[in-house]
Swiss-Prot record:
This is UPF0237 protein MM_0082. Gene3D superfamilies: 3.30.70.260. Residues 7-81 form the ACT domain. Signal peptide: none annotated. Belongs to the UPF0237 family. It comes from Methanosarcina mazei (strain ATCC BAA-159 / DSM 3647 / Goe1 / Go1 / JCM 11833 / OCM 88). It comes from the Archaea. Pfam families: ACT_6.
């Protein structure tokens, strides 16, 4: 299966259900978590994931919109970036 990898970041005030609801949206788009790191710093929830989605029949714009909408309903900020763009922006 060919795939495309993304970096997904989630930041906001901690509350119950953030991981469950964000990953439910991901599963509905057949997006798999390759790696994940999550922590809470003084009440601020932070999570970064390396995720993989099928290249075929994957609508990135719709996925980004769904993730953004879920983030807004949770009161957190969700960013979805293609791995290549993320690496380019964060190179030294």
């Amino acid at each position: 299966m060919t795939s495309s990898r993304f970096i997904i970041t989630v930041i906001g005030s901690d509350r119950v259900g953030i991981v469950a609801r964000i990953t439910t949206v991901m599963a509905s788009y057949n997006v798999n978590i390759v790696d994940i790191s999550q922590t809470i710093m003084q009440g601020i929830f932070t999570m970064i994931m390396l995720a993989e989605a099928p290249k075929e029949n994957f609508d990135l714009a719709a996925f980004q919109q769904a993730m953004d909408a879920e983030g807004k309903s949770l009161g957190v900020e969700v960013k979805v970036q293609h791995e290549d763009a993320f690496r380019f922006m964060h190179r030294i």
